[in-house]
Amino acid sequence: MSQKTQSTMKAIALDRFGGLETMKLQTLPVPEVGANEVLIQVEWAGVGKWDPFEREGGFATLFGIEPKFPYVLGSDGAGTIAAVGDDVKELKPGDRVYAFSLVNPKGGCYAEYAAIKVDDVSRIPGRLTSQQAGAMPVDAMTAFRGLDDTLGLKAAESILIFGASGGIGHLAVQLAKRMGARVFAVASGSDGVALVKKLGADAVVDGHKDDIAAAARQFASNGLDVALITAGGPATDKALTAMRAGGRVAYPNGVEPEPKPPQGIDCKPYDGMPDPQAIQKLNRLIESSGGPGSGSFEVHIARSFPLDQAVEAHRALDEHYLGKLVLQIAWDLRRLHNNSMIANPLFSGDDGSPT
């Protein structure tokens, strides 16, 4: 196994589950690398809508996991392989990779280093930057699982993507186009509409002000074939009235309220968990063409935050933004390691206010 160059690292870790006040910048040991794992020097980590759920202990309860503290957050990440386990053959130190680290027992990607099972790691596909790749994994896999496994999307089918300017949605638009579908997208705000048009959707409406059902019927006069729903509520259910009889609807587990399509339409929740075959298929789609007029696959980054501003990144999850938020891990690490205030928690009070 190639040797790592340092024994400790900076990480955003929890000593208990709870609110923002539990997130502290700590100095922790660099995780040991198992035989079927790789050690990634993390450059970027995605900040997802599910991260507060994990921070509050939701995933530990959901999966029946006994948590080990300090608990490092971060389900998405990208960087460079620093070391590989003895049984790893397909990847090597120096490879640029992205990784899934959801409820990883050795810690997530809100850290300088992460040890992750090789089955959950892939070389970065296409022309994606490390920043884009670090923001992408869970949302891209969730979009892909919905389109491919759950909906069985076919070329020339019409699809409604509700929440098309969000993390999952803006990636689903591009994947659906690469699968040959006709995409009717519902975005949030004029900026969201502009983004989704740029990403190649065939038609885009603003979910806050447009008549979605009327526009959908104009787009697909015989009714929409399928729908991928990433946000629930009255507007979603009204949009689903434009589905054809026998249509198919999918939504990731956790979408609330759950969508309620008309009778006669199949509606399934699903999980977006990765496996090596799905990761390979996702990579091939990313590297393929999205059709005439479409550019390279894009992971839209709304804002980036340095590692020691992870709390601000979590606060930003409740604001209006397009695409994804990220933490820049490999950012001025000398400052993080030398600043004496970092020996103490980032927060002094229970209200999460900076010291």
Segments predicted by a language model, with ranges:
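C-terminal hydrophobic helical "lid"/dimerization subdomain
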Residues: 2-7, 279-355
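Glycine-rich phosphate-binding loop and adjacent beta-alpha segment
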Residues: 231-296, 329-342, 347
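NAD(P)H dinucleotide-binding glycine-rich loop of Rossmann-like/cofactor-binding domains
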Residues: 66-68, 75, 90, 100-163
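Mid-domain Rossmann-like dinucleotide-binding core that forms the NAD(H)/NADP(H) cofactor-binding site
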Residues: 134-209
